[in-house]
A protein has these predicted regions:
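Sec-dependent N-terminal signal peptides
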Residues: 1-25
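Cyclophilin-like peptidyl-prolyl cis-trans isomerases
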Residues: 20-265
Length: 265
C-alpha cells in the first residue's frame, strides 16, 4: 500500500492529519481538522466571477495546452536530478485561473531541485487539487497518470531544516510521520500555520497575494472525511477523481516561466 502523506501532532496539542483516508485508516483515523489556535482565518474565497480580474502571471506567450499524455522521462525518477536556479517561477494554469509560485532554492535546496525537475517534465499537468481544507491547506501532487505515480512511489528525498515559516501562501512538501518521506505531493498554506514549522515542514516557495485569490477559489466543499483515497488516485489516475469527485479543480498545466523556461530542456 502506498504511504499516505500526512502529518501528526500529539492529541494533547491538537491533532493535524495531512492526507486523505485509505481503506485501512477510515475506522481509526479521525478526519483532518483545520487548526484552531495556531492558524489565522484565511479570507473567504471570492466568487468565481472574480477570476476575470486575476492578473496575468507573465506577459509572455500563452501557457502550453494540456497534454493528453505524459513525458516518458518521468518514468525514470532516479535520473531527474538537475540543479534548480537560485530563484525560478512556475505558472500554474488551473480550472479556476492562473497563479505563480516563486521558488527560492536557498530556503530548501533539495525540495527546490525536486520541484524544478518535476515541473520541467510536466509532472503536475492534469493533476487535481484533491484535498482542500478551508483556512488550512490546499494539497496536490499525485500524478494524473498511474504509471508516473508508480515510478515516483519510492522516490523520496531527505528532510531539510525549516528556514521559513508556513505562512499563508507558502508552498511546502507533504510527507508521512516518518522522516525523509517527501516526494511529489505539495501543499499551499491557506493561513499562517506556524504549528507546522515544529513538525519539520520546510517551505521552498511562495504564491503572491494576487495568486492566492485564485487558490482561495479552489473547490473546497467535499468533506475531509469523505474525500478521495490517495492509493486509488495513484492506481487509477484522474478518471477516479472525475467520477467520484467531479467538482474538484485541477491543474491544466504547470510550466517554468521567465529565465528558467529559457534554459535548455
Amino acid at each position: 500500500m502506498k504511504r499516505v502523506k500526512w502529518f501528526v501532532t500529539a492529541v494533547a496539542m491538537g491533532t493535524l492529519l495531512f492526507g486523505c483516508k485509505t481503506k485501512e485508516q477510515t475506522a481509526e483515523t479521525p478526519p483532518p481538522e483545520q487548526p484552531k489556535a495556531e492558524a489565522t482565518a484565511a479570507p473567504k474565497a471570492e466568487p468565481p466571477a472574480a477570476a476575470a480580474a486575476q492578473p496575468e502571471a507573465t506577459a509572455s506567450a500563452p501557457a502550453p495546452a494540456p497534454r493528453s499524455g505524459y513525458d516518458r522521462a518521468l518514468l525514470r525518477a532516479a535520473l531527474l536530478k538537475d540543479k534548480a536556479p537560485d530563484t525560478f517561477q512556475v505558472k500554474f494554469t488551473t480550472t479556476r485561473g492562473d497563479f505563480v509560485v516563486t521558488v527560492h532554492r536557498a530556503w530548501a535546496p533539495i525540495g527546490a531541485d525536486r520541484f524544478y525537475n518535476l515541473v520541467k517534465h510536466r509532472f503536475y499537468d492534469n493533476a487535481s487539487f484533491f484535498r482542500v481544507v478551508p483556512a488550512f491547506i490546499v494539497q496536490f501532487g499525485i500524478s494524473a497518470y498511474p504509471p508516473v505515480s508508480a515510478a515516483w512511489e519510492k522516490a523520496d528525498i531527505q528532510d531539510e531544516p525549516v528556514t521559513q515559516s508556513n505562512k499563508r501562501g507558502y508552498v511546502t512538501y507533504a510527507k508521512t510521520s516518518m522522516p525523509n518521506t517527501r516526494s511529489t505531493q505539495i501543499f499551499i498554506n491557506l493561513a499562517d500555520n506556524a504549528g507546522l514549522d515544529r513538525q519539520g515542514f520546510s517551505p521552498f516557495g511562495v504564491v503572491d497575494a494576487q495568486g492566492m485569490k485564485v487558490v482561495d477559489m479552489l473547490y473546497d466543499q467535499y468533506a475531509s472525511n469523505s474525500g478521495p483515497d490517495q492509493d486509488q488516485i495513484s492506481k487509477l489516475g484522474k478518471p477516479y477523481l472525475d467520477k467520484g469527485w467531479p467538482k474538484l479543480d485541477s491543474i491544466k498545466t504547470a510550466t517554468l516561466i521567465g529565465l528558467a523556461a529559457a534554459k535548455p530542456q
